[in-house]
């Protein structure tokens, strides 16, 4: 068991994990963002990346997130940060607030607007902050061995786990989408997705992904995928009338709508794309993956990678 003190309250959890995962997925504290420079918290008063520290390292430590900054102090910080107009869409604003809190680089100023205050306090919702009831979670399995051909995608071991939901492959795509590689295809890069693992148990996702076996006709040298500074993410909400609402942080909602409709082979007016504040210019694939899973499973789906 792990005991973690966050914003003056002690929490208990059974499994070791990164602090960012614990805050966002277990405590639903979404003010701290899963991206470099947006993931700052104070640990015993020292600014620390929540993505770089695990719960096992936090015994007897005091953690302060952006949600734990008192309202009066947060209002002053928001006013200070608004002065240089440096907030842009607001995604990195909570990390800036933690930095200001640590260094006391703030002062009483004229009140900030509600929009600015929501940005700085982390209350402004981005695509990765959206959670809906009874949603499933999705994780892509990326191909390896560029230049080799995939000869088998085997998820029989995963079927033995009661928490396994599904494994979506290229052959399952109803329409046209070039964002996946399947059996018989030659891998061009390690950014290509071979399968989408689905489960309702986010805590089991890593274990389930390890049960998916990809076989190739050769082993080649490739550069491993690094951890992105900012993840791609999207949530697709499935409705009983066979319509989808997709939450994106991409810059072009209409293009995303067109891509999703083409992949699902359905009319565009069955899809509504809700643009949360822009946070990732690489967005575009995640929305289609989420839409595919939501459409095929008839459940709302959330993906992040």
Question: Which ranges hold each PLM region?
Answer:
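Fold-independent oxyanion-binding glycine-rich loops
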Residues: 44, 51, 66-68, 84, ...
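Extracytoplasmic beta-rich repeat domains
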Residues: 176-179, 225-233
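Alpha-helical support elements that line or immediately flank enzyme active sites
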Residues: 88, 140-168, 195-216, 234-299, ...
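Flexible, low-hydrophobicity surface segments
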Residues: 87-222
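Short glycine-rich loop/turn motifs
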Residues: 36-39, 137, 183-185, 230-235
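Signature of N-terminal electron-transfer/Fe-S-associated modules in redox systems
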Residues: 1-96
């Amino acid at each position: 068991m792990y005991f973690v003190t966050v914003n003056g309250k002690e929490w208990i959890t059974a499994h070791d994990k990164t602090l960012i995962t614990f805050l966002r997925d277990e405590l639903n504290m979404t003010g701290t963002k899963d991206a470099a420079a947006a993931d700052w918290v104070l640990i015993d008063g020292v600014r620390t990346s929540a993505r770089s520290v695990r719960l096992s390292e936090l015994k007897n430590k005091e953690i302060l997130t952006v949600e734990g900054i008192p309202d009066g102090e947060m209002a002053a910080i928001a006013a200070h940060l608004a002065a240089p107009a440096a907030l842009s869409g607001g995604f990195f604003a909570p990390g800036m607030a933690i930095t200001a809190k640590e260094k006391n680089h703030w002062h009483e100023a004229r009140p900030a607007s509600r929009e600015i205050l929501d940005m700085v306090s982390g209350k402004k919702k981005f695509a990765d902050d959206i959670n809906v009831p009874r949603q499933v979670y999705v994780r892509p399995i990326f191909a390896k061995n560029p230049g080799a051909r995939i000869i088998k995608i085997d998820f029989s071991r995963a079927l033995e786990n009661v928490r396994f939901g599904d494994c979506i492959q290229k052959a399952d795509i109803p329409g046209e989408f070039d964002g996946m590689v399947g059996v018989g295809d030659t891998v061009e890069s390690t950014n290509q997705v071979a399968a989408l693992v689905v489960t309702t148990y986010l805590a089991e996702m890593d274990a389930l992904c390890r049960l998916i076996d990809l076989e190739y006709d050769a082993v080649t040298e490739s550069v491993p995928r690094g951890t992105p500074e900012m993840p791609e993410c999207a949530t697709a909400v499935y409705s009983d009338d066979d319509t989808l609402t997709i939450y994106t942080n991409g810059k072009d909602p209409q293009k995303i709508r067109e891509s999703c409709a083409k992949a699902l082979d359905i009319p565009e007016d069955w899809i509504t794309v809700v643009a949360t504040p822009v946070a990732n210019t690489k967005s575009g694939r995640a929305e289609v993956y989420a839409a595919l899973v939501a459409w095929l499973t008839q459940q709302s789906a959330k993906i992040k990678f």
